[in-house]
Amino acid sequence: LCKQLNLEYGEELLDNDGCLKGTNLYCFTEGNLYVMNKLKEFNLFVKDEKLEHSYPHDWRTKTPVFYKLTKQFFVDLNLLKDGVNNQLSKVEFNHSRYYNRLKSMMGNRKLWCLSRQRSWGLPLAVFLKEGEVFMPKDLQNHVMNLVEENGSNVWFNKNSEDLLPEKYKNMGLVKCEYTVDVWFDSGTSWHSVLNDKQADVYLEGSDQHRGWFQSSLLTSVMYHSKAPYKKLVTHGFVLDSNGQKMSKSLGNVVDPLDVSKKYNTDVLRLSLLSVDYVNDVKMGDGLFKT
């Protein structure tokens, strides 16, 4: 937002635990009060008011997400736009709306953030010198050989100096501690499974228009300028009777065995065979009584 408005921004104010730096004040509780009191202290406070609004929450813990300014690694997707559009136009879809949806999603993406701050996953195996990437060709080859011989965990198991060849030791190089976005990982599955061949079909749910379908196309166009698949088949999802995603935490999972006992198995089979697989299906009494 600051970049869009050409505003200067300084050092990140939050630590990795969501507290104001140098304090134990959590940003959503004591931290807010601290900032308000400081504003009042300098006569900069205007108004305190409670309002109800929508705010992003973590889907697992159901707690608010805090935003933090961090350095990341990005792919500039504008450089791939022409190649992606060209290849996408050659792909066959089981429904035209899915072509339009995927094309629109990819057209609206400008950057792909490749780095993650997680304790698990594939390492983003680059070295840094004074905060900037330092990876000459011979060092790239050295790292690739290490991973080929020892597996990707070698990056986590050894310190920076032990990973470096003699030529680059004692130069102040440090390994990057980030991991790679899992969609980049899964999106390159075409390389290990088919290498230069195209898959006849990729089949997944509609959520993969922003996931695997997209990341597979991007990585394949990056690597050898062609789509990894000839056809995309997209299916809908089985939802609860209210049209909500089934979830153990929500307690709204419909057990097919319960349906079978209540209506018999043939009714369950016939009901599911009667729906259009490209659309979402509400699983409830209404479906089986029809």
Language-model segments: what does each one mean?
Residues 3-6, 15, 34, 39:
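Long, charged N-terminal interaction/targeting segments
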Residues 28, 32, 253-256:
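Amphipathic alpha-helical segments in well-structured domains
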Residues 30-55:
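Phosphate/diphosphate-binding loops
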Residues 1-6, 12, 47-290:
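Structured secondary-structure scaffolds
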Residues 17-31:
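A short-motif feature that recognizes glycine-rich, charge-decorated loops
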